[in-house]
Structures are given as C-alpha cells and as structure tokens.
C-alpha cells in the first residue's frame, strides 16, 4: 500500500513538473515560451537589437541602457517612506515617465539621452515603461562577450509619482553612504554592491569630465570581463582630461577615467577582498552580477507578482582572451588592499603602454 502511494505521489509530481515546463507555440510561428505573455518580447528584442543597439553591438546605447536600469530601480527608500513621505517605487519607470523631474537630479546627469532614444520603442510596444527599461538593459548586455544572460521579468505597473531625489549614489559619496543607500533600497550586502559594480566593466563616463565624453572605466569597455576590477587596483598616476573634477581620482592609463567611489570601494576593508575576488574569475563575475541584477531589477515589486521571461534573452558571445595587466604595467603597480589574500599574479600585455580609446557615439 505504501509503495503504491509512493508511486502515485511520484506520478503526480511528474505531471506537475511537466505542466510547469510545457512550452507554448508563439504566434510568430518561430519561437516557443513557457508563458504566452513572453511571446511578444521576441519581436521587441529583435527590434531594439536592430534599431537601438545598432545590429547587436556592445556600444554606447548598451552602456547607457544598463545604467538606466539602475538609476530607475534604485529610486526607492523605505527609510524615506517611514517618515510618511513617498519613498519611490523602485523599478517603476519613473525616471522616464517623470523625466522632466528626475533627469534634473544631479546623479541622473546625462540619462535624458537614452530616455529619449528609448521613448519611440516604448510607444511601439505594449510594454509598460517600467518593464521596457529593464528589458532593454538585459537585451543590450547580451551583446557583450563574457556577459551572463540576465533575467527578465514583466508585469511591473508604471509609476504614478517621481522617485525622490538623492536616492542614486554619486561618485563622490563615501563608502559608508553608498553601502547605506544600497542597504536601504533593497537590503543589498556589501558583496552585492561590489557585484553590481561589475556593470562598470562595460561603461564609460560622459559628464564626470565633460571635456572627454565617452571615457571608459577600464581598457575593454566592449567586453564583460574582469579588467575593471584589475585596473581599479592599479596605482593612479594621471587624469585623462582636465583633472580636478568632483568624483574623479587619478587613473593608471591614458584614456581611462576612475571614479572616486570605485577607487574607495576597491580599497575599503569591507569590500576590498570581495573586489579582488573578481580578478581573473569570469565565472564569479557572471554569476554574482546576474544574481545582484535579478534582485535590483524587481525592486519595489514582489517576484511572485511578475512573470519571468528570461528565455527571451540570447546567450551572450563567449569571452576570448585572459585577464591581464595592461601593457606597461607590472605587479608592482598593484595597490594591494585585501588584507587576507594575495592579489592574483597576472602577466602584462606586450607592447607600448596601453592608451584607451573613448567609446564612440552611435
């Protein structure tokens, strides 16, 4: 009797699992999905790959779309809400819906450009602005060699109020302030903060030093690799542009800009070892960033209220090449900050000292 009951239970579980994994044919006659709601996203993906991301490049629009996912989602503060004032809705599209307000926040300088570029595509789809911003970021990152395939959720309602100012961390903020802001926004640990900053491996600054727009944070801004975590540990010796800009400190390479916040997080005792742990560890940077992005992309929402459509995201190209010191650098140029683990031994690229080219505009 017990054995028969066990077989019956196994059969029920098998049927349930089959139901959960059964795919539906999408109306396009090409794709299938685990949820019919996801079917429309394939066409949106192909549209923005072609017309927003220049046929699938990991370029400026990808960098800016990823930045926008964060600037929208981090706009939430339970601490502010506890005072009886609206604390923001997280990933709710408010940064675009109330662009005339939020783009005037100092921390959001420059996001108006990608908001303007995305606006026509939002109008062409049935997606909420909240969903589109996060979706576009995930689609764009899939163009970058070495990146993880990021999770996608839909079902977020759009914002009805703007986020409060000063919820987006600034590059001149202290480590204390940055860690506190992330903890308030979504209970992010210091390790998760470091993981989210992996986004800077495919990023550039336009407004920290306005004289040199498109200046990358590492020497490979078109590749999702660990060079950002290596190069922020190199001794800073120069400013790539004018110098003396708020939130900027000296960088190790011509053409590369270093944020004060990145420099300090790389050297703070609470984050230095986690920072160093990403060096030459592609599997970790992928898994940690994917997990932290998943948490960030649903801020202000419960995951159970959303539908996951991660299958729509294409597998990013594989990473080629190895972690390295830029040409002209040696291990003596590393500023060891982790007190418990030696910095991984790396060889330098051959040739003359590395000079980093700006990210070209679209």
UniProtKB/Swiss-Prot annotation:
Induction: By a combination of high manganese and malonate levels. Heme b binds at residue 200. Keywords: Calcium, Disulfide bond, Glycoprotein, Heme, Hydrogen peroxide, Iron, Lignin degradation, Manganese, Metal-binding, Oxidoreductase, Peroxidase, Secreted, Signal. The active site is at 71 (proton acceptor). Ca(2+) 2 binds at residues 201, 218, 220, 223, 225. The record marks 67 as: Transition state stabilizer. Residues 19-23 form a propeptide. Belongs to the peroxidase family. Ligninase subfamily. This is Manganese peroxidase 3. It comes from Phlebia radiata.
